[in-house]
Design a protein with these regions (language model features):
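Bacterial Sec-dependent N-terminal signal peptides
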Residues: 1-20, 379, 397
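Intrinsic-disorder/low-complexity peptide segments enriched for small residues
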Residues: 2-9, 83, 118, 218, ...
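Alpha-helix initiation and N-capping motif
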Residues: 3, 25-28, 350
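Negatively charged
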Residues: 18-335
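C-terminal outer-membrane/trafficking sorting elements
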Residues: 340-414
C-alpha cells in the first residue's frame, strides 16, 4: 500500500511538475534575481513570473532596481497588500507592461517608482493612490510617459519634488489635483519641456520649497498669479530657463523667502512688475536676473538690507535693465505715510553730472541724499535744484519729505 502511494505521488509530480515555493517578503527579491539569471531554475522553483501569487507581499521597494532588460507581463499580480513601491522600477528602462488594473490602494510610498523607466507609457489613470504620501521623483526621467492621471486623488501626498523631473513627453491636465497637503515641490517640473497645463487653481499654501520647480520647463506659460506662496522659503532657480514664462506674479507674498538665487536665470521672456515684493528676508539674489533679456522693471524700492552689495551676476546679460531700477544694496527704503500723494514729484536729469532739478513740489520740502550704504551724504531744504557735483560717481537715493509724507527716488551721479 505504501509503495502504491509513493508511486502515485511521483506520478503526480511527473505530470504537474515540482511543488513551487510561495512568494513572500522574505524571498521575492531572490525570486526576481533568479528569474533574471536563470529563467529555467526560477520557473521550476517559483513558476512563471506572470502567475506568481504575491498577495502576501507588502514590500516591493527596489524590486526591479537597475534591471534594464526586465519587461515581463505582471499585470495579474495581486499587489493589494503592498505598502511600499519606492524605486520599484528604478532604471527598469525596458519595462512597458499594462499594470493599470493593479490595486495599489494600500501603497503609501511611490517615490522614484518609475525613475529612469524610459520606455514606460501605460495607462494607470484608474490607480487608487489615495494613501500615497510620497511621490518624489515618481516619474523622474520617465521620458516616454504621457498618460492621463488628472483624476488621481493625491490629497494625502506631502512630497512631489521632482515628480516630473525630465519627464519630457508629459503634458496632461492635472489642474484639479488637491495638493493642499504638499510641502515639497522642489524640481517638480524640472525639464518637463512639454508641460503647459493650467495649474493656477492649486492650493499651494502648505508648500515651503519651490526651488527649481519650473527650471527648464520651456513650454510653461500658465497663470499662477493666485498662488498663495506665503509659506515658501526657497525659490532657488524656480524659473531658471523657463523661457516661455511671462505671467503676472507681482502680488505674490514672498515675505518668507530666504533664497532667490538664479530665480529668473535665462527666463528670457519674463517681464512682469514685481517691484512691490517684500524681499526683506532674502539673503541670496546671486544670478537672479542673469540673461533675463526682456526684464525691465523698477525694483529700486526693494528692501535688501540683508544683501550689502550687488550679488554676483545679479543682472549680467540683461542689457536693457537700467541701473536706477536696481535696489540700493544694504538698505531698506523707508515707507512714507500716504506716499502716493508725493508721486507727482520727479527729478531730472537722471543720471546727472552736476545738478538735480526737482519738479512738482508746491509746499516746503526737505531733501536728504543717501549713498548705497544708507549713509546720509547731503541734506538741503526749500529749493528746486540740488548741486551734487561734489558727490562721487555712483548710485544714490534722494528722500523727499514735506514733514508728513515722503517718497524715495533713486538717481545716478556720473
Amino acid at each position: 500500500m505504501k509503495k502504491l502511494l509513493l508511486l502515485s505521488a511521483l506520478l503526480i509530480i511527473s505530470i504537474f511538475g515540482y511543488t513551487q515555493t510561495a512568494i513572500t517578503n522574505a524571498n521575492i527579491q531572490t525570486a526576481v534575481d533568479l528569474w533574471d539569471s536563470d529563467l529555467s531554475a526560477a520557473t521550476t522553483t517559483y513558476g512563471n513570473i506572470s502567475d506568481w501569487d504575491v498577495s502576501q507581499v507588502t514590500d516591493m521597494s527596489q524590486l526591479f532596481y537597475h534591471n534594464p532588460d526586465f519587461n515581463y507581463d505582471i499585470r495579474n499580480w495581486d499587489v493589494s497588500n503592498v505598502t511600499d513601491m519606492r524605486q520599484m522600477f528604478y532604471e527598469a528602462s525596458s519595462f512597458n507592461q499594462p499594470i493599470g488594473n493593479w490595486d495599489v490602494s494600500s501603497v503609501t510610498d511611490m517615490s522614484y517608482m518609475f525613475y529612469y523607466a524610459t520606455s514606460l507609457n501605460q495607462d494607470i489613470s484608474n490607480w487608487d493612490v489615495g494613501n500615497v504620501t510620497d511621490m518624489v521623483n515618481m516619474f523622474g526621467n520617465a521620458e516616454s510617459f504621457n498618460q492621463p492621471i488628472g483624476n488621481w486623488d493625491v490629497s494625502s501626498v506631502t512630497a512631489m519634488g521632482g515628480m516630473f523631473y525630465y519627464t519630457s513627453a508629459f503634458n496632461q491636465p492635472i489642474g484639479d489635483w488637491n495638493v493642499s497637503s504638499v510641502t515639497y515641490m522642489g524640481g517638480m517640473f524640472y525639464a518637463a519641456e512639454s508641460f503647459n497645463q493650467p495649474i493656477g487653481n492649486w492650493d499651494v499654501s502648505s508648500v515651503t520649497d519651490m526651488g527649481y520647480m519650473f527650471s527648464y520647463a520651456t513650454s510653461l506659460n500658465q497663470d499662477i498669479s493666485n498662488w498663495d506662496v506665503g509659506n515658501v522659503t526657497d525659490m532657488v532657480n524656480m524659473f531658471n530657463t523657463a523661457s516661455a514664462f511671462n505671467q503676472p506674479i507681482g502680488n505674490w507674498n514672498v515675505s518668507g523667502v530666504a533664497n532667490m538665487y538664479a530665480m529668473f536665470y535665462y527666463a528670457s521672456t519674463f517681464n512682469q512688475p514685481i517691484g512691490n515684493w517684500d524681499v526683506s528676508g532674502v539673503n541670496d539674489m546671486s544670478w537672479m536676473f542673469h540673461n533675463a533679456g526682456n526684464f525691465v522693471q523698477d525694483i529700486s524700492n526693494w528692501c535688501v538690507s540683508n544683501i550689502t552689495s550687488e550679488p554676483t551676476g545679479f543682472s549680467n546679460g540683461t542689457q536693457n535693465f537700467p541701473e536706477n531700477y536696481k535696489p540700493i544694496w544694504g538698505t531698506c527704503p523707508p515707507l512714507g505715510i500716504d506716499d502716493q500723494n508725493l508721486t507727482n514729484i520727479s527729478i531730472y536729469p537722471n543720471p546727472t553730472d552736476n545738478t538735480l532739478f526737482i519738479i512738482g513740489n508746491k509746499t516746503p520740502i526737505a531733501f536728504s541724499i543717501y549713498n548705497v550704504l544708507g549713509k546720509e551724504v547731503l541734506c538741503i531744504k526749500n529749493t528746486n535744484n540740488i548741486n551734487v557735483q561734489a558727490l562721487p560717481s555712483g548710485v544714490y537715493v534722494i528722500k523727499i519729505s514735506d514733514g508728513v509724507r515722503q517718497t524715495n527716488i533713486r538717481f545716478i551721479k556720473n
